[in-house]
Every structure is written in structure tokens, then in C-alpha cells.
Amino acid sequence: TEILKNIFLTPKYVQGVVEPNLKVNLFGDIYDTPFGVAPVGLTGLIWPRAEKYLAKMSVKNNIPFALSTVACASIEDTAKHLDGRGWFQLYPPDDKSIRNDLLKRAKSSNYKVLVVTADIPASSRRERLRLAGVSVPPKNNLRTFYHAAIRPSWSFQTLTNGLPKFGTMDQYMDGNWHGTKKVKAGFAGSQMKRFLDWDYLKEVKDIWKGPVVLKGIMHSDDAVKASKIIDCIYLSNHGGRQLDLAPSPIQILPEVRKSLKKDFPIIIDSGFYSGQDMCKAIMLGANFVMTGRPFFIGIAALGEIGAQHVHDIIKDEIQNVMEQVCCKDIKSLPKEKLSINNNYYLKDLN
């Protein structure tokens, strides 16, 4: 976020009438805006039925919604609200029978795009969560009960809809794994393939037979290798939650853009809270921006209507930026209108 604050757009005026076109072509689909809802796990902890609300909002506004493997709603239940436009994010399972069944379920439920996550070779320490007292599952202590008591609306909705669960992964938990939420969380973690390799990725691509996106790429060498196998690179540092030493994706975006063919699509996330920041990413070479936290902040504050409220704010911000720099098409946001505080990075963008 601090890095994004040091990127500036220089307005250029007297260009005549500007009616910005925000539409983006991605994998043969035309989306109304250049942003979508990133995959987020255990969304039911934020608000019950969050996946349903976001799926319905995404269809209404013609933007992509990516369902996480470890979401609280299942592949099938969420698909009912996606009208065949959903994306499915896969945490690659070590057990290939589970992997193949997940892909089969997603394909049978008409998910169009597969997003394979690559950036979990080991469990991260996540010191910020530990210091904040956050745990999965939540601890049954006075602090938890206190926070539930002062948020009666959330507590009532949670009691009404049931405690959050792993909607997609629950069915793979045999007798050895049934039991407490802590045990189930352990199962979900144990099933993730720690060290993804190119052969595994090729197998996934062959099985899916549709657009495959590789999420978590942070190095141009990896991007070049991946571009020979899959259909899109997804720059991400896991929302800053996986490796504290990792740079922001916006820092490595220009280098990755230069390393790939001009028409090879790049998606980016991590730290994008506003339409202004999304415009900066597009000007630096991204084709599309995914964001998670803003939508869930909206839902946490306002429930179902919060998702639409956040969408409208971001869309209005992007349109306003394009009008201010007199740009008629989102694909034409010109790089030369950028200026950057060089104390951060990237002196030459051309």
C-alpha cells in the first residue's frame, strides 16, 4: 500500500469528450470492469453466506468471482449463483484422487477458469495473526465470547446458519479426520501439496481442458516457464500473509511484463483497495486486478449489500481516473503518464 502511494498519474486535458470504456476481454469473455473478486478462504468467518452474496453480485455486474478450495460454501452450492461464470481456485492436493475429484466437481458445476495456487510450499508463521489472537478454528475463550457478544448481528446470523465449515473439503474427511474444527483444519492443511512442480501443473492443465491461471508467481523466470504451460500469470504475495520478506507484486510487475509476450495476460492482486491503485497496476502492465479484502470489509460492515457497495465505489473510482487523464479505453491507459518516487523503485518504465 505504501508503495502504491508513491506512484502518480499525470492528468492530460483538452482531449474532447471522454466516455471511458472499462470492458476487458479475458479468456474470451468480456467483463464489464477490469477487476474481480479474489479467492478467500473461510469466508463464513467474516459473514455467513458470504460466497453466495459475492457470487450473485459478480453475476449482476459481470465480473469474475473466484471460489477458494477452503471456502465455507461448496463448489456445487456456490455454482447455483454463478450462471456458469465462476472461477475455481485450487490449493493443489497431495492426494491426486482428491485433486482429480475437485477438478471434476468444478468442471461439472460449470466453473470456467481454474486458478492454481503455487505459493504455499510451507505454512507461514503469520505473526500478525498470532499477535491479534486470530486462530482457526476460533478459540473458545472469554475474548472470543466478548467479541461475539458486542456483534449481535454477526452472532445471530452465525447461529442461524451454523458454524463455518470447509464446504468443499468436508466430504474427503474420512473417519480419521472427523471431529473438531481444529482436526478438520489440520486435514485441510495436510492435503495441500507443499512443493508444486511443473509436471504436476501440466497434469492439471491436461485434466482441466480450459483456461488455467497460476497464482502466486513473484519472479519473472517462473513467469516465463509457466507461460509455456498455462494461460495466464497471476502475480500475488498471498495478500502479504505468506512471506514477510516478499516484495509487493506491483514492484515486480514491469519486469514480469517485459519478460512475457505482449499479449500474454497478467492478473495481479495484493494490496489493491481502490480503483486508483488498480489503474496504476494496469498502466504498469497488468491486464486485470483481483481484490478480496475490500469486498469482505463491505460484507462485514453491511452484509449482502456491502458487496455491491464496494463494487460501485471501485468502478466509479476507475471511471473517474480515466476521465481525469482523458483516456477512452482501459486498455489504453498510457504508461508515460506515470511518475514514481524513486526512493521506492523503478526509475525507467519505458
Annotate each predicted stretch with a short phrase.
Residues 1-29, 137-196, 331-333, 339-350:
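An N-cap/entry alpha-helix motif that binds or orients negatively charged groups
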Residues 1-7, 191, 248-269, 273-350:
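Alpha/beta catalytic cores of nucleotide-metabolism and tRNA/nucleoside-modifying enzymes
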Residues 1-121, 314-316, 333-350:
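N-terminal capping/small domains of soluble enzymes
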Residues 20, 41, 125-132, 147-198, ...:
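Glycine/Thr-rich beta-alpha phosphate-binding loop at enzyme active sites
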Residues 35-38, 65-67, 86-90, 114, ...:
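Hydrophobic faces of well-ordered beta-strands that scaffold small-molecule active sites
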Residues 37, 58, 116, 204, ...:
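Conserved, mostly hydrophobic/aromatic
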Residues 46-51, 67-85, 93-105, 121-132, ...:
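Active-site-adjacent beta->alpha loops and helix N-cap segments on the catalytic face
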Residues 69-72, 93, 214-220, 264-278:
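Glycine-rich beta-to-alpha transition loops that act as phosphate-gripper elements at the mouths
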